[in-house]
């Protein structure tokens, strides 16, 4: 089937967005590397946001300088940026392969007017690509602001980046469609093709990688928000640290609920987020170990350690619930429909045995005989049809 004008417009606009995404990915790789070296337009090294050698948990915020609170240091920040760069690169490769798959399938398997639109919606629609572009752009802006040591502006920019990333992963999993629309879209996917392989194998891998990044983004969002709070209000540094840990814990719990009640309807295997939560737990635990003296002097060592330990405990509990509901088939909602029968219902063809009615009395039999003689027998349907056909034949012969 030849592609219509609307299909050609969808394909061309989708490829153009993919081209812009590739350019944005190159820029997102260049900006962190350029911000690492001096003399390239960045005033400060963006990784050294605070001086942890002056960390004091018993003092309050001072408006004269940047009060050090809990944040990512140089190794953790580099790991986060490098992992984000790797995940975005894998996603760009996936989208390029998706464009090749759609181009190869449109000449052979585009049998309906909705085929190409369904393919693009399942692989990654225009809105998903556009949000992915905004996500990479906001990450570059965050690095720019960090290099200028604007803590409040950096927290605001990263809040925007986190919201965009949340919308992106939600749209990628749900395909921006209702649950009942997904099977209808999948009916247009041809079997044993490159497109089917991308949807069944590579897209789940890409989604799980994005989920691991989402968990790390929750951690960085919590740390940047509480750093902005700690440098804006007259609060203890320890309160800002407790707030960051509890905020990260609350965000993960919200995502667990979102996964169990909504996202599992679209994709069952979601392990990337749990891996990201464990990595975030290790990142939070490193400052407690690295700056143990500061926590011990403030008598907060055990309290912070116990508070941070709640993160992996709840994560393990969420994994157990996911295994119970997914692999063991327990607590799964029943289908809202009844399956059709595979074979026709059997009909009982046993002959019915009619019992002989009891004999009538003599007077009744005599009356019935008189009635039969006086009343002519009714004509059957066959006799009526036969007589009508003969009358028509006679009329035709007379006419001839």
Swiss-Prot record:
Which InterPro entries does the record associate with it? Herpes_glycop_M
Q: Does the keyword Electron transport apply?
A: no
Q: Spell out the protein name for this chain.
A: Envelope glycoprotein M
Tell me, how does this one assemble? Interacts (via N-terminus) with gN (via N-terminus). The gM-gN heterodimer forms the gCII complex.
Could you state what the record's PTM comment says about this protein?
A: N-glycosylated.
According to the record, the residues making up region (Disordered) are 348-394
The way this protein sits in the membrane is described as: Multi-pass membrane protein
Q: Which GO terms describe its cellular component?
A: host cell endosome membrane; host cell Golgi apparatus; host cell nuclear inner membrane; membrane; viral envelope; virion membrane
Provide the protein's localization: Virion membrane; Host Golgi apparatus, Host trans-Golgi network; Host endosome membrane; Host nucleus inner membrane
Q: Say where the protein is mainly found.
A: virion
For the Intravirion compartment, the record's topological domain ranges are 1-16, 98-113, 174-208, 256-270, 322-400
Gene name, per UniProt, is: gM
| Sorted UniProt keywords | Disulfide bond, Glycoprotein, Host endosome, Host Golgi apparatus, Host membrane, Host nucleus, Membrane, Transmembrane, Transmembrane helix, Viral envelope protein, Virion
Task: Please state which protein family the record places this protein in.
Answer: Belongs to the herpesviridae glycoprotein M family.
Q: Which residues lie on this side of the membrane: Virion surface?
A: 38-76, 135-152, 230-234, 292-300
Q: What is the organism of origin for this protein? A: Human herpesvirus 8 type P (isolate GK18)
Its transmembrane ranges are 17-37, 77-97, 114-134, 153-173, 209-229, 235-255, 271-291, 301-321
What is the role of the protein in this entry?
Answer: Envelope glycoprotein important for virion assembly and egress. Plays a role in the correct incorporation of gH-gL into virion membrane. Directs the glycoprotein N (gN) to the host trans-Golgi network.
